[in-house]
């Protein structure tokens, strides 16, 4: 698909919830492919502002209403898993006999138009995807992308020029949409139960990731851990032994991102090269790291050992896609993080640095704070807004333990998203605050339920040299932005 070819010309797509990171990207891609697009959301966002500025669409902002759905019998109404069936715009679509399209279905269509690299895993999808985009761009491969956050300075969460061969997407397990994608290269970063409403057990989750990997036609990039390598599909008789998968006389080598790869079956009638990766003992610096990959030194400007792992996964996927290794590495040198992934927003009035992060699982909170600790010359202050009552109830103790690693922890009430408080009696952010206080053994923990409660306390609390990390998948980024007086252009 190269300009001026626009295969979706004549289609009319209406996006319900277009202000989100995912849906706004699909609207942008559909517009680039020639479709007429419209959208609505309850609140304006940076994404609706960018869509308007770029001439893609002017979203209707406010309560969802049937009047938002354009006239015409050919309109397709696209919705995400966060939009319930009783949403007025979905109800109107059904009453008018319009086509209702789940977000996952549209993404599957998009992946059929390109050779697709799909990044899956419980943690690290957005950062790994953003790094991969930067590596492919630096190598001259002109990728398109649909990512859950901006991929870097001056770049958006989605880009679709139609001039390159590759599309980079996140493969979301929360609604099993990863199982509908057309995948050439699959990346699997890790597996941990997070979406309890979708998966009843870890074994059920693992089977879903196994099915995802079976969709890969060209390559599988997987963290070199036995429990993940065990999910890699292979011909009958293949055996997973420790960190190496044995296929006849050949091995898929483990060993820290140096996997040589071997041809094994990965789905009916397909073959994929399997590449395990790792990044052992990166040298952590003030806000970055150094490590060696395939004989090259890699320098990152994002903190934490987890980001060295993300970068290694991205580099291996880029290599499989045809990128020259040194050019791909150069593309990561100037990467300072994806949007809402340890994103420096600016400084407070007293000179504290304020970061925004999407962490909403204990493992993510712990990794984010470990990375932030390398930057904190004074106190590390963690501000956390839990996301979903169900997750809070299941993981309160684990969240508390992670937050206790900060010098000061501030816990807000739950951002409910699609859940209702009455369905989860007795569950609030206070459960996490109490768990953090127990784990902190006397360290300061604040329970400040609302953004309005937290703002004045934090403004008074922050001091020069502090690092304040505001975490959560809800609207807590609004609080983070109110804490700064000089921004970082974010």
Give, region by region, the residue ranges found by the protein language model:
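Acidic, Mg2+-coordinating active-site environments of NTP-dependent enzymes
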Residues: 48-52, 69-102, 108, 112-114, ...
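Glycine-rich, highly charged phosphate/nucleotide-binding loops
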Residues: 52-70
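NAD(P)-binding Rossmann-fold cofactor-contacting core
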Residues: 36-50, 143
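Short internal beta-strands
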Residues: 35-42, 219-224, 381-385, 405-418
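C-terminal helical cap/extension that packs against the catalytic core
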Residues: 54, 400-464
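Walker A (P-loop) phosphate-binding motif
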Residues: 15, 29, 103-151
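Conserved N-terminal Rossmann-fold NAD(P)-binding element of oxidoreductases
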Residues: 13-18, 471
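Nucleotide phosphate-binding/pyrophosphate-handling subdomain across enzymes
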Residues: 3-14, 22, 29, 33, ...
